[in-house]
Amino acid sequence: ILLKKPDAFLKELGDCYLMERDYEQMMPLFVRTLELNPGSIDNITVQLSFARSNDIVNSIDPVIEKTLKSLCQKTDYLPVFDELAVWYNLQIRNYLLALQHAVLLNNKSENKLHIFLNIALDAINNKAFDQATIAYQKILGKGKENNPFYLPARKGILTCRYEQLRQSPADRSDYLQIAGDCEKYMQEFGYTPTNIDILSLLAELYAYRLQRPDSADRLLDKAIRMPRLNSNTLSQLKSQRADLLTFMDNPWEATILYTQLEKANPNNDIGYEAKLKKAMLAYYAGDLLWAKAQFDVLKGATSKLISNDAIQMSHFIHMNYEAEGDNRDLEKMGRTEYLLYKQQFQEVLPRLDSLIGHCSPGISDYATLQKARSLCACFQDEEAAKLLSELKDRSEQVYIKAEALFQLAGLKRK
């Protein structure tokens, strides 16, 4: 009143109602803020995200939905409200409605194609692959000219198709088709540092889906020799090639690459991961004490995932190693895990059954965990869940019970 500006401090008043959780009063103020300043959309969505994360009784979503419905029923509502609708529908994973509003937004405004890219990435993260594909196709439909999102969409749709196939058993012909499309992409846009992600995807297809590991190795070697690669990309390619060499039963060259990665990345997760993988190679080969020493060093790694894996492996070896006794079962477990790494499931499962049936509880329970992993890799989730459920009830080892529960939770999230 004093300023004679009734629309002054709308956003600030809305923030006050937000803190009081009075969402019915908050939303009209945020809407008016967007009408006066559409550029404040990011600020408003940040505040709404905060409100949703602290809304323990789920009272804000009905208010947002009612507000959006009322706004979008008007004939000439502002494009910013389509943008708000896209944001909200991404939060609740309603990708089809998000796509509808993205189309409306792009019909009204220029330079909004990135909205489709955001939808696609979010959809892939939540395994909504069909909706992600539609979003990418909307970008590709605009053509190459004056379209900065054309190449990201071409790449994204290839990655999306591959991730979709990985979720269930797929025919070799499906992987061949994606590999062919990746090859066409590389021929069209070149073997350059900007296309390393597609080259890496093609190498993965060759190695693990099409039984052409030699082709994958040549491709990765070519990529590593590419000029003007940044150090992080080079490290990722070397790590991928070292993993492939391990898969190809060439642990010596893999160890050399992992050692190079360690030295080039002494204090980051790339180096720690290389050290972990090198320790796993020693474990596979039966060099148990050296492997355990490396796992012990990695217990303090900055990455929680690497640290947890190192702790688990160190504990497993410590609890089952006989300083003056026979460690053949432990060594056999290591060799069996190497077969599992190489995806030789027909050979792995009988070996695991033998270990489960004849070894001490420490090795038997651990072998059961690995059998569950093998079954999941073969898309036998129900059998894996049954095995894990029985294991968590019968095992007397705390870390085994915890890992069984963790894997069960992962299966339920599927």
Where do the model's predicted regions map?
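Acidic, polar-rich low-complexity tracts and alpha-helical solenoid repeat scaffolds
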Residues: 1-414
